[in-house]
Amino acid sequence: MEKILIILFIAIVYTHAGFAVKSYREIRNEGVVRQNYEESCGAAAVATLLNLLDMHQFSESDIVSKMSSNTNMVSFLELSKVLHDLGWENKGYQISREVFEKLNIPVLVKIQNDPRYPHFVVVINQIGDFISVFDPNFGKYISSKDEFYSIWDKDNLGGYVLIVNPKNKFMPSHKLNLPTNKSIFDK
């Protein structure tokens, strides 16, 4: 019996897992600022985008406090102004699927399952047929491009994106030369 206890003790002492086990919920929420209010997806998406681009970590309340009005039916223009106030160069565009395919940085997009309720998420275009989606309401997930296009560019006329020019020196490969043509704010 003594030998069994010694072996059991040694087994317990030396069987330390070198990794942390995470739940599906933890994995899904990793890297995503979740929205705390029904219509605060814009603020949470901006915080998520900035956290992906910078070492500084923003919260949803940091962004909401910079907004000039409440979070009800926030527009790309208001999100752009908040980003500008925080010192980030940005511009909104309506772009085609072909242009979207060339993007390799996180961008904020407006998606619509129901035209009455637009929703803002952050997406990263991946090589192949998939897109990483950082949704303030649901969390992080992978979507096929066809599924994404069905809620971003339903009519094949182009979808709306807000492109933020990274200023972090750790991401020089993602520095963009934003086009000088008309943005959606110039209409």
Language-model segments: residues:
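Sec-exported extracytoplasmic/periplasmic mature domains
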Residues: 46, 50-55, 68-72, 84-88, ...
